[in-house]
């Protein structure tokens, strides 16, 4: 998840290490704090593998600042991860948010739609945070306390909103509408706050009580 975020933000634009950390923290810091001891070793590994390079550039003060750039190898790796994500990238909500933040960097609407369809298929499976003795998913109406009712009601509403968005976006992409494409890097930081504001989310039980 961290390497995908690094690749994605550097695909948006070259960044200094501090700026990269700030963007990653906004996108996924609510899941796991982005510490220097995690980020910079990852950057070094990716530099050693040829996926990014560092260039010294003049800073505001006397000391030069190192700017990170994605290489062609890094761009190819990003596109591979976006086009063929792991199953966990589809099913885990937090990993999905990171993937979704950079899906615009796939050039083909058909490739974008294929990834969204995998998420749609996952969400359409009946699931819940709670099951009865027969392993049947339980809905909010089956609980007498307001807390489990609230958990399942919120999860259901979140899931229904995502399902509606997925279906509409897949339909638009399959019609060849390319407005969801990569665009420019001008709004590179725009999506970061969205992930943070969404919070951890309901996780694997997000379609709880759908009753579909």
Per-region residue spans from a language model:
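Amphipathic alpha-helical dimerization/coiled-coil segments
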Residues: 79-128
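Acidic interhelical loop/turn segments
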Residues: 131-151, 181
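Secondary-structure edge/capping motif, primarily at the C-terminal ends of alpha-helices
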Residues: 104-107, 134-141, 173, 177
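Basic helix-turn-helix/winged-helix DNA-binding cores
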Residues: 1-92
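Small-residue-biased low-complexity repeat regions
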Residues: 179-211
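Amphipathic alpha-helical coiled-coil segments and their boundaries
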Residues: 109, 116, 145-148, 152, ...
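Heptad-repeat amphipathic alpha-helical coiled-coil interaction surface used
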Residues: 113, 120, 127, 134, ...
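Long, low-complexity, charge-rich intrinsically disordered regions
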Residues: 152-176, 207-212
